[in-house]
Amino acid sequence: MRILVTNDDGFDSPGLHALARALKPFGELVVAAPDREYSGASSSVGPIPLTTEKCRVAIEGIDEAWAVSGPPGLIVFLASMDAFGAPFDLVVSGINPGANVGNPVYLSGTVGAAIVARMVGVTGIAISQESVNSLVETFSDHQTNEQKWETAAHIAASVVSN
């Protein structure tokens, strides 16, 4: 099984890293995530630039990882056109630091990536978790670093394994 892991928080997100490591045993895994923050991007794919930059990045324990100059919806769309090799069987987006519940779920780039996956005929899963204390989107922040990333990653892995 080929698995694409993405998010809306950028390739340096600790939630993305934990998720990728947890899903690695389930197939050929590729990480392709935005080169910067795209929270609130929903399932947007544009405006589509004439060129979209992608560059290899290092994530500990992951063989193939890319930083892409675009929102997660565009990344999933590009993946459906073989921008990262053969077609994917599954797209998993997250782990988002924030619950993504209620009406704001429609604005979530994390959820948007899963929606675009479904639109291109691939199963998509979005993983979010409530933040410690308050919503924090800066990954150097002490509260975000206290998130229980491994717990959410373990739950995601159990969903994928079934």
Give the location of each predicted region.
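A cross-family phosphate/adenosyl-ligand binding-site feature
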Residues: I3, P14-D82, A86-P87
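Short, Asp-centered acidic motifs that coordinate Mg2+ and/or phosphate
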Residues: L90
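Glycine/threonine-rich flexible loop motifs
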Residues: A99-S108
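Hydrophobic/aromatic ligand-binding patch that stacks against planar heteroaromatic rings
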Residues: A113-R118
